[in-house]
Amino acid sequence: MSSGLWSQDKVTSPYWEERVFYLLLQECSVTDKQTQKLLKVPKGSIGQYIQDRSVGHSRIPSAKGKKNRIGLKILEQPHAVLFVDEKDVVEINEKFTELLLAITNCEERFSLFKNRNRLSKGLQIDVGCPVKVQLRSGEEKFPGVVRFRGPLLAERTVSGIFFGVELLEEGRGQGFTDGVYQGKQLFQCDEDCGVFVALDKLELIEDDDTALESDYAGPGDTMQVELPPLEINSRVSLKVGETIESGTVIFCDVLPGKESLGYFVGVDMDNPIGNWDGRFDGVQLCSFACVESTILLHINDIIPALSESVTQERRPPKLAFMSRGVGDKGSSSHNKPKATGSTSDPGNRNRSELFYTLNGSSVDSQPQSKSKNTWYIDEVAEDPAKSLTEISTDFDRSSPPLQPPPVNSLSTENRFHSLPFSLTKMPNTNGSIGHSPLSLSAQSVMEELNTAPVQESPPLAMPPGNSHGLEVGSLAEVKENPPFYGVIRWIGQPPGLNEVLAGLELEDECAGCTDGTFRGTRYFTCALKKALFVKLKSCRPDSRFASLQPVSNQIERCNSLAFGGYLSEVVEENTPPKMEKEGLEIMIGKKKGIQGHYNSCYLDSTLFCLFAFSSVLDTVLLRPKEKNDVEYYSETQELLRTEIVNPLRIYGYVCATKIMKLRKILEKVEAASGFTSEEKDPEEFLNILFHHILRVEPLLKIRSAGQKVQDCYFYQIFMEKNEKVGVPTIQQLLEWSFINSNLKFAEAPSCLIIQMPRFGKDFKLFKKIFPSLELNITDLLEDTPRQCRICGGLAMYECRECYDDPDISAGKIKQFCKTCNTQVHLHPKRLNHKYNPVSLPKDLPDWDWRHGCIPCQNMELFAVLCIETSHYVAFVKYGKDDSAWLFFDSMADRDGGQNGFNIPQVTPCPEVGEYLKMSLEDLHSLDSRRIQGCARRLLCDAYMCMYQSPTMSLYK
């Protein structure tokens, strides 16, 4: 492709810029006239059409027979002006330009450009649209809803359009934002439930495959398919669990102010299933509604009873009715209240049966001696009549309670009530908290109760009279048949109640439970159908762990009884690491890796790096005990081998109790303290374990300027910051450090652990460091043949002062043969250099290497230990491919509160390979915040890089 680079200076002076854009169809190679460097403008780059002020247009007439050329300002390189042939570009409109410009990878951008259908659909994606998001290549797409559409940074003539998406369902917790970008709130969602992505990562969910619209439709949702209105008095049915309930239509219309949501239907049910009083937002829509037998639902959830096939749905509903809380799929059946005179008469209905568990539900003050609800299960000996709560006198008694059908998954007298609509909150397009269409009907009933905005409420202190010692984070149970087990996440007294409640996160889902909200206010956050609010006095310490209650000591708590659900295996048989696909299948997933507990991440991540996919240090696990070893040598070695390393390699998981055993052993060392509770550094752990307990042969032997050899287990890079260097490689850092300190390896190491240059945990010398996949240490070894930097022959002299000379192999250690050394130092600027002879084996004749191939000593990167804000994580390589990387976090998730459990996780991160293929210049210019997935932590937060020698590990 022919093109010319006009200038690297700003072009605003000689040119007019027009809002016309072109996309390059071929790669363009041009020369910078200032630096004479070859620049590449890849296929898929976008340029803005510029107009020559003097000529009046930028289509430069070419020689006869040649096509015109177009002047473009490349948007990714705003100071570069190119002139390209018309045949090598295609004009694109501004809206497409904005969508494509957000895709930083030109190859992926060009691929999307060719998919015109998908690109056109991108114009339709707006706030409120249901989408699928591709977070990582090769993985499944997660469902979500667009909450933001627009540029992230409006700093250019034209900016790329990004989409802020709230991830739903299985995608929750897989994101990286709560809607904030560079300190600016662009939308609102829960932490780590949002992402900002370009169009290439999005797929608009069509009508046929959406399962989200009815609960997540935006105000301008064009996907909503409306059914024709149903006639008043027509018979209809709806599905409740596994059964069909019937009723008569008394209302069918759109809701005032919510017309875009489509038709809603009010149904007078044959059985007492209902919650609607005929009002919406204070407007009386229907005068025939009986609160306890009338229900308001979206028309998509109604089955017209036109024939005997009423059991078949008119069309597949957008969301299964069960998912809105009518019942629990785990229930075998649903018992319905009998339509007796006492229950069918509204005046005789028991209004106290239901104190709410659900967000937006209500309470009544009339206690009933024979009705005991799960919500208020008090002490076993307590009078059931006292088990119902009292509410404040200002409660609007004219607002009837919601009375859904009970579910028989609980005992007969203590049924859990589940409402036949969703009360799940969802952020509106403006970021405020709204409700799905089906929750709007409940809102009208509860408008008196839900006047307070939904917000995170701080936990209130537990009253001192609590005899059980329960607190936030305690494992508790609620006596039922069967009992409920969970972790107390909140304790306090909600407004309008004179009872202290406990909010529990249950172990298992239960119909009727929420995600942490009570009466419209959020007190904590958990998975849907897992939050239960009960009287605090109804709670008891979890009887399954009676010996551990109450527990305040996190060290003593870390035992096999408390961690009963997280225990790992003991494996006696020596097990080499499984690599490639086999290792991947064993290791990836949640509850994989090493479980973290109580500031153990430094130790978890270090052990995972050293042993998960490398056997270079397996000799540490096998050396027999010697006379001079400490008394707990065998105990430590056996623990490491059979309870940590072998189970990790076979099952991919190690419980925190095993690590606590090791931490207690580390505490026995006289020079050590705080290993069971405090945050430590990996180097401190390695020093105590390797030197004081296992007496491991030092991994490194280093000599400084001919002095005595020094032994160590890892090498810390010390150096001053070089402002000229953008992104250094590990190879460069190691060579710089050795040259400046005049160091050499006395022996080739089998394992090389390099600590990155930084001042403390927080201050990094470089914003990014490129982890060299292969490390050539040949020039850093003493008594080793080395190549002349000029002719490739046997080097006899090394010159440290030539190291920074850019004219001779810039950035390389300078060693020369006799002839080349003389020639190099004849130059006037090198006349005063002091060079030294290279240390060579004494029995090595010069001529044996003069024309031969001098072997290199290379080491392979097998793991990187990273730290960010005092939390250590690990990257390990499980195969030969550059993309064969796994990311490990010992505390990736949490089960329960303060006395809960960390859930470790290992995830593949193939995106790392793409960044390791980038040039250092491209990596330097790349905004760290734009680095996808886990790769940012690898490139920006490296703390230790671990290398192994495939050959030397056979001998050491």
From Swiss-Prot:
Region (Interaction with TRIP): 106-593
Chain spans, region Disordered: 309-353, 392-411
Membrane-protein topology: Peripheral membrane protein
GO BP annotation list: innate immune response; negative regulation of canonical NF-kappaB signal transduction; negative regulation of canonical Wnt signaling pathway; negative regulation of inflammatory response; negative regulation of interleukin-18-mediated signaling pathway; negative regulation of JNK cascade; negative regulation of NF-kappaB transcription factor activity; negative regulation of non-canonical NF-kappaB signal transduction
Residue segments, region Interaction with IKBKG/NEMO: 470-684
Coiled coil stretches, renumbered: none
UniProt xrefs under InterPro entries: CAP-Gly_dom_sf, CAP-Gly_domain, Papain-like_cys_pep_sf, Peptidase_C19_UCH, USP_CS, USP_dom
Listed GO MF terms: cysteine-type deubiquitinase activity; K63-linked deubiquitinase activity; zinc ion binding
Residue intervals of the CAP-Gly domain: 153-198, 253-286, 492-535
Annotated active site: C601 (nucleophile), H871 (proton acceptor)
Positions contributing to Zn(2+) 1 binding: C788, C791, C817, C820
EC number, as in UniProt: 3.4.19.12
Modified residues (Phosphoserine): S387, S418, S422
PROSITE patterns: CAP_GLY_1, CAP_GLY_2, USP_1, USP_3
Keyword line: Cell membrane, Cell projection, Cytoplasm, Cytoskeleton, Hydrolase, Immunity, Innate immunity, Membrane, Metal-binding, Microtubule, Phosphoprotein, Protease, Repeat, Thiol protease, Ubl conjugation, Ubl conjugation pathway, Wnt signaling pathway, Zinc
Positions with biased composition (Polar residues): 330-349
Residue ranges of domain USP in the record: 592-950
Catalyzed reaction equations: Thiol-dependent hydrolysis of ester, thioester, amide, peptide and isopeptide bonds formed by the C-terminal Gly of ubiquitin (a 76-residue protein attached to proteins as an intracellular targeting signal)
GO cellular component: centrosome; ciliary basal body; ciliary tip; cytosol; microtubule; perinuclear region of cytoplasm; plasma membrane; spindle
Family membership: Belongs to the peptidase C19 family.
Name of the protein: Ubiquitin carboxyl-terminal hydrolase CYLD
Gene that encodes the chain: CYLD
